[in-house]
UniProtKB/Swiss-Prot annotation:
Subcellular location, principal: nucleus
Pfam families named in the record: S_100 (PF01023)
Keyword Protein biosynthesis set for record: no
Coiled coil: none
Keywords recorded for this protein, A-Z: Acetylation, Calcium, Cell membrane, Cytoplasm, Membrane, Metal-binding, Nucleus, Phosphoprotein, Repeat
Modified residues (Phosphoserine): S46
Source organism of this protein record: Mus musculus
Name this protein carries in UniProt: Protein S100-A6
Residues that hold Ca(2+) 1 according to the record: T28, E33
Amino acid sequence: MACPLDQAIGLLVAIFHKYSGKEGDKHTLSKKELKELIQKELTIGSKLQDAEIARLMDDLDRNKDQEVNFQEYVAFLGALALIYNEALK
């Protein structure tokens, strides 16, 4: 049986691949795919406006290829984890 942290990491990977590749490259998230992931998988997603998601996409897309790769996605999750940690203090 997998440990809880192993399961959590597996879930983060599975969610990325659930949305990546719906259009184009199966190893990256397009703006549309990222928007769908955020809106369906995060509580805050339904509260974000299109312009906010576009800004987030621009911030996450470090190599400016108009897509979010797995490394950029993990950086996003790390930033979210820091925010969640601060909220628990």
